[in-house]
Design a protein with these regions (language model features):
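Bacterial Sec-dependent N-terminal signal peptides
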Residues: 1-31
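Cationic-aromatic interfacial patches
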Residues: 26-169
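Well-ordered beta-sheet/strand-loop patches within structured domains
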Residues: 23-61, 66-71, 142, 162, ...
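Prokaryotic Sec-type signal peptides and long signal-anchor helices
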Residues: 10-13, 90, 98, 215
Length: 583
């Protein structure tokens, strides 16, 4: 790869020199050539001129393309002598089906290229137009291949996204052009995304396309946040039934206007299938959240699928390996994987919109048992200082100590009204124990945002439907099960190491006031109780973790799921996807 990049660097210097020369010869007598006897030198000169007019893109694809042409004496890539359009036709055929990936063909100049191609077939193009065709086809070819392999949008442009992903480089460009020369059809077929998650979403998109032309009457929003109770009548019930019949949750009934006047159990069952699919609260009432989800057009659901197809095209720079943890912030869940199979699943609490959980990739390297909590400055300034103005007992009740320059001080001696963003000299530390906000276990991983996974002393928060309530860290529902997942998976024959791991697990259990369960743990507790206390455990190996954001995905049961765009990231990505256009 280093040699390829150095080669491209040298070529770019030569190409720049060539492109800076005058092109008066190209501009003279630019007429329709004799297609049986094309002047190769004139065509190459026209291509050189056309490349000099090409705009540089921030992602460097343009300069890579220029360098490829320059390193091959500006020979045409797609215009074959004698004229043969098979390769361009092949590429256009793939681009005509780009809708399965969430884009429109003309975003890649499909109509412009098609017109130029037809003129080529009719031998109507001048040398300069032949050059335009050749370079434009190269540009859309690279954009198409790069988009499918790495994504059409670089996620790094989004403030919330902090994961490193693979990017186009000179090696990829060389691979594309070499494939174009020898096995284009095979290469275009192989570069299509083939993961199970991607193909499953594409299949579901096909299903939703079947619903696009279906007409249903929008359901009126309920006034004053009222709800429709099970067993009651309401004018919207037939409309709700009709909408569920279209998408298949409720069997079709041509007499629905008279069959569904009351919110009955049959409708409830269908409605809860829909609510499960869209991440809504499952209950025996119909509220405005459900009505709003029912009122979304099928085109809007398709758009959500398209946005998440793009997310699936983003390939992490570092492989997650066979054992890893994935937090889907939008779904507010954590799944732990072994060999791409979910081994452990749980609810989590994530950051509210103004304190969003950062999307990143890292590795859990350490477990902290009975952690203390150093309160972030933002919480001191925006929350605790305001409470402390009125309630000095807050600190004692919540086991929080206050320090100034390393010395513990009495919080009642502080004038909390003077705490501002420019004046906050105090360090607040909450004692470890069952009352600690981090609970009994913390999972540390490197990141610049000081976020981590942790247990919680407020278990009720994990029973909420909307769990986007934290200051950015992730509260986990099953901390002890997650601890067990973090231990190495060893075969039973490794008796000694398994016994050591069982003992370590029991030390953690004992340290958080749970009973030990292994034979080794019971013996150690009896012979040396002090040895059973542990406050930190460094993991070996580290466990990869990815904080992700998927608002549409296929669950382990193979069912499509939609989730609220809690951080408004779908809309930002959709704007970028709609703006794609190859000039």
């Amino acid at each position: 790869m280093r040699h390829s990049r150095f080669f491209f660097f040298l070529i770019s210097l030569v190409t720049s020199s060539l492109l800076s020369t005058t092109f008066s010869q190209t501009l003279l007598s630019d007429s329709v050539p004799d297609y049986q006897n094309l002047n190769v030198q004139k065509l190459e000169s026209s291509i050189r001129f056309e490349l000099s007019q090409m705009n540089f893109n921030p992602d460097l694809k343009s300069i890579y393309i220029k360098n490829w042409y320059g390193s091959h004496n500006f020979q045409p890539v797609w215009i074959q002598i004698p004229i043969n359009t098979f390769k361009i036709d092949t590429l256009l055929n793939f681009i005509s089906h780009i809708g399965v990936h969430g884009l429109k063909p003309d975003q890649l100049n499909f109509n412009i290229i098609t017109k130029l191609l037809n003129d080529l077939k009719n031998e109507m193009l001048t040398y300069s137009q032949l050059a335009v065709l050749d370079t434009k086809v190269s540009a859309i070819y690279i954009q198409y291949c790069a988009g499918l392999k790495y994504g059409f949008i670089n996620p790094g442009i989004f403030e919330a996204y902090h994961k490193s992903v693979q990017q186009v480089d000179s090696v990829f460009i060389i691979t594309c052009f070499k494939a174009q020369k020898t096995h284009l059809l095979n290469y275009l077929s192989r570069i299509q995304p083939r993961t199970k998650a991607y193909l499953s979403l594409q299949a579901e998109k096909d299903n939703y396309i079947n619903f696009v032309d279906s007409v249903f009457t929008p359901i009126p929003v309920l006034a004053n946040n009222q709800t429709i109770k099970l067993g009651t009548s309401h004018p919207s019930i037939p409309l709700i039934a009709r909408r569920l019949m279209i998408s298949g949750e409720l069997p079709y009934d041509p007499m629905y206007l008279s069959s569904y006047l009351t919110f009955n159990y049959k409708l409830l069952k269908a409605l809860n299938i829909f609510r499960n699919k869209t991440g809504l609260l499952i209950d025996e009432e119909i509220g405005n959240n459900t009505i709003n989800a029912l009122n979304l057009t099928f085109a809007e659901y398709i758009n959500k699928i398209d946005v998440n197809l793009e997310r699936l095209r983003w390939v992490p720079l570092t492989s997650l390996g066979k054992k890893y943890i994935r937090v889907n912030v939008a779904d507010m869940t954590l799944n732990a994987f072994k060999n791409d199979t979910v081994a452990l699943s749980m609810k989590v609490c994530v950051g509210r919109q103004k304190n969003s959980t950062p999307l990143l990739q890292s590795k859990i390297f350490e477990l902290v048992i009975n952690p203390t909590w150093t309160v972030p400055n933002s919480i001191i300034i925006n929350e605790i200082a305001k409470i402390a103005m009125k309630d000095h007992s807050y600190f004692e009740r919540n086991h929080i100590r206050v320090y100034l320059q390393g010395e513990e001080i009495d919080p009642s001696t502080i004038d909390w009204t003077k705490i501002t963003i420019n004046h906050q000299p105090y360090k607040l530390v909450q004692d470890s124990g069952s009352a600690n906000s981090l609970g009994r276990i913390k999972f540390n991983f490197k990141n610049p945002f000081s976020v981590y996974l942790h247990d919680t002393n407020a278990k009720g928060a994990l029973k909420r439907h909307d769990r986007a309530i934290s200051h950015g860290c992730v509260r986990v529902e099953k901390p002890l099960e997650l601890v067990n997942f973090c231990f190495p998976d060893l075969k039973p024959v490794y008796v000694t190491q398994n016994q050591k791991n069982d003992l370590l697990k029991d030390k953690i259990r004992h340290s958080i006031d749970l009973k030990v369960i292994s034979k080794a743990g019971k013996e150690a507790l009896k012979s040396n109780p002090k040895s059973m206390k542990i406050d930190r455990l460094r993991l070996n190996p580290f466990i990869p973790i990815i904080m992700d954001y998927k608002t549409c995905f296929i669950n382990p049961k193979g069912k499509i799921q939609f989730r609220n765009d809690i951080y408004s990231l779908d809309s930002l990505l959709n704007i970028q996807l709609l703006a794609i256009h190859q000039h």
